[in-house]
């Protein structure tokens, strides 16, 4: 595990606006991703992730503008994902201030995207986003964890553990592991999935999906994650980044 545990808020951005509800009384505009990013920076976030949920070419410039404005105000690593299909997309996001780029569906459709991006920009730039769920009924994968797309609505039949290991071989620098079963439940991370992923990859794992309280975070690290990512519990002010870090410290983990 890396030395300090990273705590990462995630912002879903649709046509330049944050779409999951955000409740901060001190923000003039809780839907503005730049203002919200600055708030999380003040709270002590280690990194930030923007997910462009529209991700159509017509909205690409909007996201570029958001990243540019954010990078001028915050000085922690910024990851941008959603609709990244080519090395040129990666180049444009890095040029406007992103530090890392996450890929998902496009890499499933063309795994060479991973190696092409890694060779051109370095594997530290590339985050593989895996939306995984437990198979129900008849099992088609060896591990029982299947890769999904379309926000968990579409099955791929691809084993999530196999895919992450393959992506690491191709040059991915990190895995963002999002449990589609736990996502939005606020019942805690899928620890079994994290443990299973830790056994097959050596690159850092960012655990996502299921955080509901500060006490949910240390078990994810104990299971093998190097970083923890959450959205709604931070947006609604249910838990602060400081409270998560305090809980991690109490559990004996180093935080920045």
UniProtKB/Swiss-Prot annotation:
InterPro entries given for it?
Aldolase_TIM, His_biosynth, HisF, IGPS_HisA/HisF, RibuloseP-bd_barrel
Q: Amino-acid biosynthesis: is it a keyword of this entry?
A: yes
- Print the keywords alphabetically: Amino-acid biosynthesis, Cytoplasm, Histidine biosynthesis, Lyase
Catalytic-site annotation from UniProt? 12, 131
- Kindly state which reaction or reactions the protein catalyses: 5-[(5-phospho-1-deoxy-D-ribulos-1-ylimino)methylamino]-1-(5-phospho-beta-D-ribosyl)imidazole-4-carboxamide + L-glutamine = D-erythro-1-(imidazol-4-yl)glycerol 3-phosphate + 5-amino-1-(5-phospho-beta-D-ribosyl)imidazole-4-carboxamide + L-glutamate + H(+)
Listed EC numbers: 4.3.2.10
Gene Ontology MF term list: imidazoleglycerol-phosphate synthase activity; lyase activity
Among Gene3D superfamilies, the record links this protein to: Aldolase class I
One Gene Ontology cellular component? cytoplasm
Query: Does the keyword section mention Amino-acid biosynthesis?
Result: yes
Alphabetical GO biological process terms: L-histidine biosynthetic process
Pathway in which this enzyme or protein is active? Amino-acid biosynthesis; L-histidine biosynthesis; L-histidine from 5-phospho-alpha-D-ribose 1-diphosphate: step 5/9
Chief location bin: cytoplasm
Subcellular location, record wording: Cytoplasm
Question: Subunit structure, per the record?
Answer: Heterodimer of HisH and HisF.
Q: Tell me which HAMAP family the record gives.
A: HisF
Explain the purpose of this protein.
Answer: IGPS catalyzes the conversion of PRFAR and glutamine to IGP, AICAR and glutamate. The HisF subunit catalyzes the cyclization activity that produces IGP and AICAR from PRFAR using the ammonia provided by the HisH subunit.
- Which family does the record assign? Belongs to the HisA/HisF family.
Q: What is this protein called?
A: Imidazole glycerol phosphate synthase subunit HisF
Q: Which organism is it from?
A: Bifidobacterium animalis subsp. lactis (strain AD011)
Its organism's taxonomic lineage begins at: Bacteria, Bacillati, Actinomycetota, Actinomycetes, Bifidobacteriales
């Amino acid at each position: 595990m890396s030395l300090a545990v990273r705590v990462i808020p995630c912002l879903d951005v649709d046509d330049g606006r944050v779409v999951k509800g955000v409740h901060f009384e001190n923000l003039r505009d809780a839907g503005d991703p730049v203002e919200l990013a600055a708030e999380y920076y003040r709270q002590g976030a280690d990194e930030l992730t923007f997910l462009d949920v529209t991700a159509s070419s017509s909205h690409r410039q909007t996201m570029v503008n958001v990243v540019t404005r954010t990078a001028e105000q915050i000085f922690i690593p910024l990851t941008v994902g959603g609709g990244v299909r080519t090395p040129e997309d990666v180049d444009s996001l890095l040029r406007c201030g992103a530090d890392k780029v996450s890929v998902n569906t496009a890499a499933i459709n063309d795994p060479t995207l991973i190696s092409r991006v890694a060779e051109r920009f370095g594997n530290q730039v590339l985050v593989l986003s895996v939306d995984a769920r437990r198979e129900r009924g008849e099992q088609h994968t060896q591990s029982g964890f299947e890769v999904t797309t379309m926000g968990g609505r579409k099955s791929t039949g691809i084993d999530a553990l196999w895919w992450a290991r393959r992506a690491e071989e191709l040059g991915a620098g990190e895995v963002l592991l999002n449990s589609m079963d736990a996502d939005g439940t606020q019942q805690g991370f899928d620890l079994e999935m994290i443990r299973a992923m830790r056994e097959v990859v050596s690159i850092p794992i960012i655990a996502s999906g299921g955080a509901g309280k500060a006490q949910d975070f240390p078990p994810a690290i104990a299971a093998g994650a190097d970083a923890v990512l959450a959205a709604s519990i931070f947006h609604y002010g249910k838990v602060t980044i400081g409270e998560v870090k305090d809980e991690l410290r109490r559990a004996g983990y180093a935080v920045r």
